Regions:
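Gly/Ser/Thr-rich active-site cleft segment
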Residues: 9-11, 22, 122-240
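Short acidic-glycine loop/turn motifs at beta-strand connectors
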Residues: 20-22, 88-90, 167-170, 253, ...
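Carbohydrate-associated surface elements
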Residues: 102
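Alpha-helix C-terminal capping segments
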Residues: 248-254
Length: 266
């Protein structure tokens, strides 16, 4: 039997699983890591903790399953969305990652909306709002409040994309994470160059965007040693946790999901 590997880079920990082609769960391992709140409303993590947890959990999952590495045929990702991992010219992490639940960027989000000509203008660029959790506000915050770190930043990634980069050596994201920056034109499925230009960001720092089912690369020799996965294993882009969970629930076509609201509580 062949197996697929999955990695979810969560907020409280990373989970690594192996699933058989018949759908049975062959192994599951979780490793927790800390969250830091240096100021009220701030939420940060050390990306090195994600990687250490991923390597340990995946190696343990392979051992737990008893599966031969050669029978593992693919790997994909989900993970916490919107976090900012800033990388320098050597792809080293510049500062702790700013997470999805960080609330420091309220002023920056309003500034982005104003720069776009108001909410209607922003929707014309991206078909999306700009919320404090989104990555776009974090980029502007870094530019305004940590200009030295911003100047050092040559690339940025979101959390799961950073771990996939360490697995494959390729810097990329998927459409769901790109949308979660608030700077991505959802209809055109590309970053909005006009909006990014208005904000004074350099397009060169933005990652390549893939569809969730696109091949993102292959497990490198070094990553194989650290994780127990086979070298050369195909790695697919995956998506943000809030998106991938819908796929897991079978919400893959129009009419399978809706919403309701409570107008009055008795």
């Amino acid at each position: 039997m062949k197996y697929l590997a999955g990695i979810d880079v969560g907020t409280s920990g990373v989970k690594c699983i192996l699933v058989g082609e018949d759908g049975h769960l062959a192994a599951s391992q979780t490793r927790a890591y800390p969250l830091y709140t240096p100021h009220d409303g701030w939420s940060e993590q050390d990306p090195a903790d994600w990687w250490a947890g991923t390597c340990d959990a995946m190696k343990a999952a392979v051992e737990q399953s008893g599966v031969k590495p050669s029978d593992i045929v693919g790997l994909s990702f989900s993970g916490q969305m919107h976090g900012l991992v800033a990388l320098d010219e050597r792809d080293e992490v510049i500062r702790p990652a700013i997470l999805w639940n960080d609330q420091r960027t309220d002023a920056e989000c309003r500034e982005i909306i104003d720069a776009a000509g108001g909410l209607d203008g922003l929707l014309a660029y991206t078909n999306n709002n700009m919320l404090t959790g989104y990555t776009g506000g974090k980029l502007l915050w870094l530019k305004k409040h940590e200009p030295e770190n911003y100047a050092r930043m040559k690339h940025f990634l979101m959390p799961k994309d950073y771990i996939r980069f360490l697995m494959t050596g390729r810097r990329c994201t998927d459409v769901s994470e790109a949308s979660g920056t608030g700077l991505f034109d959802v209809k055109k499925r590309e970053f909005s160059k006009k909006l990014i230009g208005l904000l004074g960001f350099d397009m060169a720092v933005f990652p390549e965007v893939l569809e969730s089912d696109e091949l993102a690369g292959h497990v490198t020799r070094e990553a194989a040693k650290l994780t127990g996965l086979p070298e050369g294993l195909p790695v697919y882009a995956g998506g943000g946790d809030a998106v991938i969970q819908n796929t897991g629930m079978g919400i893959v076509e129009e009419g399978r999901i809706g919403r309701a609201s409570c107008r009055e509580r008795v």
